[in-house]
C-alpha cells in the first residue's frame, strides 16, 4: 500500500506519561526529529495515582535515569514538598530516596521542559494505527486520518490502552483520571500479531485537607539533611519549608464494613478480570488475604501546595462510593473527612514483554518499541526507566550505532528489563531490591559512577554535567588511592590516641583504608590520624568512600560473580537457531526457548523452568556448530 504522509519524523512516541516523556526527550536530545503524541496535553507527566517519586529500589532507578541524562530526577527536585531517605537504619544496598510531589507543579514543569526541547514536537492527537511494511515500522495514522512517517515508533500508552474504569457496579471505557481510552490502537497491536495481556491497578479516595483531624494521626516529617535525586541539584536549594505527611490506620470497624460489602466489591463479584498488583493490593484484597491483621497502615499524603486534596496511601479500592465513604469515616482522624474523589480500579491491555528484546524493541516488528505500563510494569519510576532505554535505542538504531543493553550488574533498570524480557510477568511488575542479585553494587550513592559515562557516550549527558561527574570521580579515585597508600604504625603515640577514643590499639601496621574497615572508624577519624585530602571533599564523596571501603569484601565478591556472568552474556545464540534440532534438552526448556528466543547463554540460563543441564546441552550444541563452521 502506498501511503501519503503529511509529516515526516525520525521517531514517534505514542503517549506522554513518564515513559513517553523520557523516551521523547532522549530521542530528540540525541538528534532525532521526534513527535510526542498524547490524547490529552493536560495529562503529560501526570500522576494519576500516588503523588510521590522514588522509594525502595524505585528511588535508585530515578538516580539511574538522571545519571543517563534523563529528566525525572531534575524535575522532582524542583517540585517536591517533602524528601526522605528510606531505610537509613539498614545497609547501603537498600537505602533509597523518596519525594512527596506537588503533582500539578511536577506535570507543569515537565510540560515546559518538553515544549522547549529542540527537535521535539508535542501534539494532542489520538494515534489509531501503527503502519508496518515488510516487518518494519514506517509511521502512524491518527484518528483524524493524518499519516506521519517514522523510522521508529515507541508505544508508551500506560493504562489508557483499552482502559476501563471500575467503581462498584459501574464500568466504563476510560484512561486514567477519566481521560479517553485508546481502543483502536489496542486492536491494531493485536492485529500486528503481538500477544496481549490484561492487567488491573487501582487508586484510593482523596479527602479534603481541612476536614482531617490531624491531631489524631502521627506526623511524618521530611528530612532536614539535604538529599537530591539529581546529581546536578545543589544542597543550598534544598527545601526548608517541607509539608509533612500523616500516619493513621484502619481498624476493626473499617474491616467489618469491608467484609459486609465484599459481595459488592468488583474484585470479588467477577467484574474485575485483569490481574492486579501483588505489592500494592486493594484494601478489600488486604482484608481478605491478611485476615489475621487487626489494622493496616494508611499514609495521608498532600497532593501539592495549592490543593486541598489528600491521597490516602494504602486505601486503594473499587468498592461502591457509599461503602468508600463509610470506610473513610471509620478511620481515626478521618471521621468527618470530606471525600473529594472516589477510588477506582482500572483495567488495561499490555504487550506481553517476552516478545521484546533487551533494547525494548519488539522481536516481531523492526523499529517498534514499547515501554512503561504497556510492558506490564507498575510505577512511574519503572516506566521512566524503560522510556529512556527505549528512546536511546530507537535513536541508536536510526543512527546505525551499537545498541544499548543495560546488564543486571549495570543498573536496576537492567534488572527490570531482563526480568521482563526473560521471565515475562503474570502480574503488574514492581521493582524490589530483592530482585537484584548485585544490589550492593547498584546503590543510590554510586548511580552516577555506574551510568554517567554511558549517558555521555550516547549523547544525553552534556559537557557541564560530564565535567562535574569527572571531578567527583577523580576526588573519589584520588582519595581512595591516598588512603590505600598511607600507613599507620602501632607506635605508642598513635595507640594512645586510639585508646583515648575508646577503640582497640593497633598490633600491626595498617593502611588508612584498612583502618577505616573497622566498624567504628569513619572517614573523619581516619583522616585525623593521616591528615586531610589535598582538596576539600564533597560530603557525598566521603559517604561513598566509607561505603566502598567498609563493604569492600562483599563488593569484590559481587564483582567476581559479575565477571562470571559476563562470560555467559558474551556467548551469543544465533537468531536462526533450530531449537528442535537440539537433542536431550527438557521439553519445558525447549518450549521456553522457542517462546522467548534468548539472545545469550546468560539470558537462557535465567529463564524459569530451564535447569543447568539444559544450559550445558545448549552450550555443547553451539560449540559443535561453531567447530563445524570453522572446518
From Swiss-Prot:
GO process terms (BP): tRNA methylation; tRNA wobble uridine modification
Co-factor(s): FAD
Alphabetical keyword list: Cytoplasm, FAD, Flavoprotein, NAD, tRNA processing
SMART domains: GIDA_assoc_3
Keyword Flavoprotein included in the entry's annotation: yes
Binding residues for FAD: 15-20, 127, 182, 373
Family indicated by similarity: Belongs to the MnmG family.
Matching PANTHER family: GLUCOSE INHIBITED DIVISION PROTEIN A (PTHR11806), PROTEIN MTO1 HOMOLOG, MITOCHONDRIAL (PTHR11806:SF0)
UniProt-recorded name of the protein: tRNA uridine 5-carboxymethylaminomethyl modification enzyme MnmG
Phylogenetic lineage: Bacteria, Bacillati, Bacillota, Bacilli, Lactobacillales
Encoding gene per record: mnmG
Amino acid at each position: 500500500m502506498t501511503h501519503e504522509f503529511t509529516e515526516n519524523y525520525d521517531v514517534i512516541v505514542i503517549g506522554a506519561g513518564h515513559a513517553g516523556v523520557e523516551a521523547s526527550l532522549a530521542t530528540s536530545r540525541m538528534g532525532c526529529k521526534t513527535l510526542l503524541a498524547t490524547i490529552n496535553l493536560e495529562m503529560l507527566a501526570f500522576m494519576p495515582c500516588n503523588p510521590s517519586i522514588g522509594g525502595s529500589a524505585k528511588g535508585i532507578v530515578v538516580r539511574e535515569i538522571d545519571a543517563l541524562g534523563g529528566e525525572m530526577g531534575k524535575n522532582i527536585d524542583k517540585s517536591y514538598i517533602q524528601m526522605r531517605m528510606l531505610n537509613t537504619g539498614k545497609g547501603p544496598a537498600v537505602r533509597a530516596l523518596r519525594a512527596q510531589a506537588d503533582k500539578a507543579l511536577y506535570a507543569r514543569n515537565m510540560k515546559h521542559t518538553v515544549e522547549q526541547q529542540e527537535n521535539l514536537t508535542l501534539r494532542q492527537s489520538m494515534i489509531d494505527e501503527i503502519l508496518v511494511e515488510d516487518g518494519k515500522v514506517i509511521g502512524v495514522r491518527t484518528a483524524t486520518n493524518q499519516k506521519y512517517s517514522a523510522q521508529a515508533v515507541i508505544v508508551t500508552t500506560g493504562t489508557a490502552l483499552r482502559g476501563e474504569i471500575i467503581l462498584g457496579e459501574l464500568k466504563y471505557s476510560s484512561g486514567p483520571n477519566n481521560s479517553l481510552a485508546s481502543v483502536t490502537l489496542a486492536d491494531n497491536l493485536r492485529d500486528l500479531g503481538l500477544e496481549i495481556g490484561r492487567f488491573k491497578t487501582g487508586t484510593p479516595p482523596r479527602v479534603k485537607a481541612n476536614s482531617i483531624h490531624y491531631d489524631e494521626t502521627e506526623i511524618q516529617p521530611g528530612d532536614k539533611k539535604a538529599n537530591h535525586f539529581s546529581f546536578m541539584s545543589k544542597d543550598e536549594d534544598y527545601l526548608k519549608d517541607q509539608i509533612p505527611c500523616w500516619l493513621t490506620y484502619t481498624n476493626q470497624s473499617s474491616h467489618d464494613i469491608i467484609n459486609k460489602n465484599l459481595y459488592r466489591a468488583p474484585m470479588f463479584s467477577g467484574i474485575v478480570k485483569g490481574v492486579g498488583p501483588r505489592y500494592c493490593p486493594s484494601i478489600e484484597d488486604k482484608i481478605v488475604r491478611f485476615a489475621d491483621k487487626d489494622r493496616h497502615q494508611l499514609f495521608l499524603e498532600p497532593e501539592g501546595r495549592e490543593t486541598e486534596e489528600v491521597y490516602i496511601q494504602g486505601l486503594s479500592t473499587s468498592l461502591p462510593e457509599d461503602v468508600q465513604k463509610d470506610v473513610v469515616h471509620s478511620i481515626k482522624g478521618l471521621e468527618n473527612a470530606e471525600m473529594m474523589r472516589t477510588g477506582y480500579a482500572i483495567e488495561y491491555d499490555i504487550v506481553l514483554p517476552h516478545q521484546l528484546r533487551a533494547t525494548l524493541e519488539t522481536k516481531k516488528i523492526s523499529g517498534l518499541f514499547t515501554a512503561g505500563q504497556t510492558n506490564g510494569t507498575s510505577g512511574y519510576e519503572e516506566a521512566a526507566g524503560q522510556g529512556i532505554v527505549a528512546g536511546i535505542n530507537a535513536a541508536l538504531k536510526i543512527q546505525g550505532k551499537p545498541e544499548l543493553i543495560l546488564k543486571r550488574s549495570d543498573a536496576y533498570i537492567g534488572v527490570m528489563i531482563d526480568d521482563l524480557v526473560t521471565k515475562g510477568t503474570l502480574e503488574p511488575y514492581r521493582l524490589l531490591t530483592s530482585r537484584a542479585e548485585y544490589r550492593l553494587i547498584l546503590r543510590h550513592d554510586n548511580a552516577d559512577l555506574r551510568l554517567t559515562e554511558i549517558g555521555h557516550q550516547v549523547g544525553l549527558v552534556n559537557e557541564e554535567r560530564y565535567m562535574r561527574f569527572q571531578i567527583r570521580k577523580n576526588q573519589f579515585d584520588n582519595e581512595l588511592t591516598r588512603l590505600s597508600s598511607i600507613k599507620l604504625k602501632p607506635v605508642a603515640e598513635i595507640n594512645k590516641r586510639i585508646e583515648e577514643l575508646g577503640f582497640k590499639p593497633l598490633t600491626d601496621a595498617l593502611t588508612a583504608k584498612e583502618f577505616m574497615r573497622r566498624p567504628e572508624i569513619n572517614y573523619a577519624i581516619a583522616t585525623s590520624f593521616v591528615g586531610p585530602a589535598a582538596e576539600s571533599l564533597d560530603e557525598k564523596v566521603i559517604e561513598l568512600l566509607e561505603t566502598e571501603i567498609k563493604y569492600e569484601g562483599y563488593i569484590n565478591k559481587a564483582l567476581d560473580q559479575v565477571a562470571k556472568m559476563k562470560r555467559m552474556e558474551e556467548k551469543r545464540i544465533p537468531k536462526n537457531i533450530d531449537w528442535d534440532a537440539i537433542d536431550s534438552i527438557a521439553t519445558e526448556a525447549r518450549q521456553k526457548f522457542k517462546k522467548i528466543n534468548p539472545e545469550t547463554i546468560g539470558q537462557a540460563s535465567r529463564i524459569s523452568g530451564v535447569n543447568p543441564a539444559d544450559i550445558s546441552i545448549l552450550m555443547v550444541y553451539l560449540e559443535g556448530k561453531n567447530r563445524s563452521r570453522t572446518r
